[in-house]
Amino acid sequence: MTKGILGRKIGMTQVFGENGELIPVTVVEASQNVVLQKKTEEVDGYNAIQVGFEDKKAYKKDAKSNKYANKPAEGHAKKAGAAPKRFIREFRNVNVDEYEVGQEVTVDTFEAGDIIDVTGTSKGKGFQGAIKRHGQARGPMAHGSHFHRAPGSVGMASDASRVFKGQKMPGRMGGNTVTVQNLEVVQVDTENNVILVKGNVPGPKKGFVEIQTSIKKGNK
């Protein structure tokens, strides 16, 4: 069955394995996870738990900052006996009988050796050209060339008379939802509420990430 938890990427470091191998790891802090709602096949058509992460400030009238919860979010969290949460995600295909509304989900949900998928938001790179954004080849860098980093042809002239949808062109790069699959949990530190994940995960330091059992290898 699927397991999941929400957290923040702290940064990267390295640890030694039992065989002396040096392993690069990403440190993910995963505290304040609370089950806000249980969904079942009988009522909702599928099994899932809804998990909230990171407290928001209580509702405040006329508050314009998103640090404050709105009334519906505050009421939803109140049913679970929890503070309103900034991030809320669902994890499907879980054993809902193992969870109760209001229960805290801790890092010991996972253990060393588990294979997981990590979802985050990639670093924003701003407006970039086709070479950096899409990996296109550049033109000749010789003195006589007129095209060094230009994107080249974007379509036909008289026949199509338009640029087709999906044409790779310069534009804003990064800031996308990215999932890295089949990463390994190297270590779980229950004292500090952190999980050490082998390799790197999407996003900058302090970026929000979602960890769940690998969809390809986790249930074998």
Curated annotation (Swiss-Prot):
Keyword Zinc-finger tagged: no
Listed SUPFAM superfamilies: Translation proteins (SSF50447)
Molecular function terms from GO: rRNA binding; structural constituent of ribosome
GO biological process: translation
Coiled-coil ranges from the UniProt annotation: none
A GO cellular component entry from the record: cytosolic large ribosomal subunit
Keywords, in A-Z order: Ribonucleoprotein, Ribosomal protein, RNA-binding, rRNA-binding
Stored Gene3D superfamilies: 3.30.160.810, Translation factors (2.40.30.10)
Presence of the UniProt keyword Amino-acid biosynthesis in the record: no
Pfam families: Ribosomal_L3
Transmembrane segments: none
HAMAP family, alphabetized: Ribosomal_uL3_B
Family to which the UniProt record says this protein belongs: Belongs to the universal ribosomal protein uL3 family.
Protein role: One of the primary rRNA binding proteins, it binds directly near the 3'-end of the 23S rRNA, where it nucleates assembly of the 50S subunit.
Subunit structure: Part of the 50S ribosomal subunit. Forms a cluster with proteins L14 and L19.
NCBIfam families assigned: L3_bact
Protein name: Large ribosomal subunit protein uL3
Native species: Staphylococcus haemolyticus (strain JCSC1435)
